[in-house]
């Protein structure tokens, strides 16, 4: 193949048809002896005399090796290139001196010519640098789009995590009204009452036996003996000897409970002529004293009053920190002490600072204590005495928090704390759980203490003024 190429280089004037009529056997023979004949032909070409001494025609001289390095070559316009005959070797005019063309390129061109297949035109022929960059960028972009990412093969002992599924967007929950949240909190008491009452009066007329059974049901629901007797008495006077439905009982029950609760549903009065107005918050462990104080502070400071919070629960570090967070959140002043310090001494310091800073309201937290712990109840008495020495009317308000889930135990708590600390009002908390809210009716009927607020959640807006009629309807399921 190489030998045939060398012959072509030095025989440009000969008829091209002669090379095409060569037998295929000679071509195959030449290809078989390619390695041996090529080296010999190359040696002969290198040993050949200079080009200017060869007996070649002027036309061969002009086309064999290209222009000399020191001679200018006129480039014909692009339109004339199409009319001229194509050079014998494609790309020869771009390669400069034939002696500088790599041997591999010469071999490839000669082999392609022998097989009758034209070599493809070089991609960079006639393209400037910008066009070439554009082509390369398009090729890279196409390969990036078309070639899918092949995940790596992990070694033994490893596994690929599954693709995480996109979370399904959760539709925002519709915020319940206050009455809806109250009804949900009292659902336990209400559902038990309505179910049992409906079963009691199925296909029965109202008589003494059914009245006694109804009274037992009401007492078991923590409504208290007094309230149960009021309900059965009102029902007897209206429907005795007649058929009674569950709706009739619920309507009468809601009305009687409202009558019991209305006298105690009062707003919390603040005497701002006393600066500060001192509110002492008491209660057993876990009734939500600290959270209730934070909610009260949010309401008062939101109304423009200057509030100070005192961390009187010196037995729990968490209580001190929690009250500090509420103070920061509500923009209230805060005073605390070290863990285990005297709570009465803290109350004294808190009152002095509140008076010096002209605070409108001072709310003092206290440690949770069981009503049967004599020493803790004595400490509570000491706090009340110390505040009384600073101001004969202090504490001006003593609030007791009640857990709505405790049932009858709340009745005993009110009685003892009222005797020790002089409780002046109640706040019922945790009505958002499995509440047994009927006990509030029994406490109101017995102690006649004002019920200022009830809580149905952890948020500030979940502490609302007590409304007797709403509470009664929620219990009765009306």
Curated annotation (Swiss-Prot):
Pfam family membership, one: SRP54
InterPro entries, A to Z: AAA+_ATPase, P-loop_NTPase, Signal_recog_particl_SRP54_hlx, SR_rcpt_FtsY, SRP/SRP_N, SRP54_GTPase_dom, SRP54_N_sf
One of the GO biological process terms: SRP-dependent cotranslational protein targeting to membrane
EC number: 3.6.5.4
Keyword terms: Cell inner membrane, Cell membrane, Cytoplasm, GTP-binding, Hydrolase, Membrane, Nucleotide-binding, Receptor
Source superkingdom: Bacteria
Region Disordered: start-end pairs: 14-94
Protein's job: Involved in targeting and insertion of nascent membrane proteins into the cytoplasmic membrane. Acts as a receptor for the complex formed by the signal recognition particle (SRP) and the ribosome-nascent chain (RNC). Interaction with SRP-RNC leads to the transfer of the RNC complex to the Sec translocase for insertion into the membrane, the hydrolysis of GTP by both Ffh and FtsY, and the dissociation of the SRP-FtsY complex into the individual components.
Name of the protein in question: Signal recognition particle receptor FtsY
Species this protein is from: Agrobacterium fabrum (strain C58 / ATCC 33970)
The organism's taxonomic lineage, starting at the top: Bacteria, Pseudomonadati, Pseudomonadota, Alphaproteobacteria, Hyphomicrobiales
């Amino acid at each position: 193949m190489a030998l045939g190429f060398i012959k072509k280089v030095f025989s440009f004037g000969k008829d091209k048809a002669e090379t095409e009529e060569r037998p295929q056997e000679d071509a195959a023979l030449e290809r078989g002896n390619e390695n041996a004949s090529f080296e010999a032909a190359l040696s002969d070409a290198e040993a050949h005399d200079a080009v200017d001494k060869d007996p070649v025609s002027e036309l061969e001289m002009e086309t064999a090796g290209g222009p000399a390095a020191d001679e200018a070559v006129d480039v014909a316009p692009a339109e004339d290139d199409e009319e001229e005959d194509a050079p014998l070797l494609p790309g020869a005019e771009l390669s400069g001196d034939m002696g500088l063309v790599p041997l591999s390129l010469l071999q490839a061109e000669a082999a392609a010519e022998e097989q009758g297949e034209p070599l493809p035109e070089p991609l960079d022929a006639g393209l400037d640098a910008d066009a070439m960059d554009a082509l390369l960028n398009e090729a890279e972009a196409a390969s990036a789009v078309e070639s899918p990412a092949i995940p790596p093969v992990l070694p033994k002992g490893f596994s690929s995590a599954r693709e995480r599924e996109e979370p399904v967007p959760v539709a925002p929950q519709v915020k319940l009204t206050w009455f809806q949240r109250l009804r949900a909190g009292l659902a336990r008491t209400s559902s038990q009452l309505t179910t049992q009452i409906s079963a009691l009066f199925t296909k029965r007329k109202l008589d003494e036996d059914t009245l006694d059974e109804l009274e037992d049901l009401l007492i078991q629901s923590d409504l208290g003996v007094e309230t149960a007797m009021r309900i059965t008495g009102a029902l007897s006077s209206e429907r005795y000897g007649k058929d009674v439905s569950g709706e009739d009982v619920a309507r009468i029950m809601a009305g009687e409970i409202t009558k019991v609760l209305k006298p105690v549903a009062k707003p919390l009065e603040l005497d701002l002529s006393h600066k500060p107005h001192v509110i002492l918050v008491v209660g057993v462990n876990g009734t939500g004293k600290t959270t209730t104080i934070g909610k009260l502070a949010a309401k008062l400071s939101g109304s423009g009053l200057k509030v100070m919070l005192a961390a009187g629960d010196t037995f729990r570090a968490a209580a001190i920190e929690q009250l500090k967070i509420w103070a920061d959140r509500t923009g209230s002043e805060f005073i605390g002490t070290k863990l285990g310090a005297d709570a009465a001494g803290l109350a004294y310091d808190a009152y002095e600072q509140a008076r010096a800073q002209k605070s409108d309201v001072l709310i003092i937290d206290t440690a949770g204590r069981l009503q049967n712990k004599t020493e803790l109840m004595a400490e509570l008495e000491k706090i009340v005495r110390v505040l009384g020495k600073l101001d004969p009317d202090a504490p001006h308000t003593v609030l007791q928090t009640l857990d709505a889930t405790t049932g009858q135990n709340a009745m005993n708590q009110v009685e003892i704390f009222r005797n020790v600390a002089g409780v002046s009002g109640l706040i019922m908390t945790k009505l958002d759980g499995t509440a047994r809210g009927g006990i509030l009716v029994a406490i109101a009927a017995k102690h006649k203490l004002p019920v200022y607020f009830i809580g149905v959640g952890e948020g500030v807006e979940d502490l609302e003024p007590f409304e007797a009629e709403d509470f009664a309807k929620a219990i009765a399921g009306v």
